[in-house]
Amino acid sequence: VVEESQLYREMVQNGTKGIIGEPTNLEVIHAHKGSVEIKATSRGVAGHSSSRKNVSANLSMIPFLQEMKAIHDEVETEVKWQNDMFEPPTLSWNINVKDDSPALNVTAGKTICRMYLRPMPGIDVEPLLTRVRQAGDRHGVKVRINHWGNTFFASSDSDFVQDSLKLAHRPKSKTVSYGTDGGVFTEIADKIVFGPGSIEQAHTINEWISLEQLSLGTDMYAKMIRHWCCGK
């Protein structure tokens, strides 16, 4: 849509207001974190551990992981990587590791480390990603980085956010640590994330929304449409 839609281009040019529908318990959200996936792969030669004709993929992954642990600890403790606007105020650097060894006495032919971090507005994570790539080069680990979603930010003092608060009868806007489609529509200046239901009930096995929230949300969306589209 962002790359090919002419309608979206017109929306950007005309200053269209945007409401990203997500379960916020009808709270007005003016900022959220982004998302970045890192996939690091090391390769070896699978074989029975009693033979010399094998090389464990874990051996090149281990020193790489040591550097990733150092980055993890750094972003958890150093203020320059944190933003107190959010809870938690960190990048939430998560590390998962898995190899393909079928048994304890068989060396791993491939080991994969998947990492996930949540960038925040005002913090440039590219220096960290560069360090990950450099660590991969040093240890023979292939690194692939995917930017899944950008950060989302609108000034809490903007007229649009303040009007939204009045319509929703909320005292102040909030931030959340998850991501939404709002991270894609970055060229829309006036925007909020807003909707019925709770994020704790969304994306679960038994995903649900209360009828009360659904009814309130329907009424609120209608109210916002009348206000901004019909001038009422």
Predicted regions and their residues:
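Acidic/histidine-rich catalytic neighborhood of metal-dependent amide-processing enzymes
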Residues: V1-E37
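Metal-dependent amide/peptide-bond hydrolase catalytic core
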Residues: H30, E37-K232
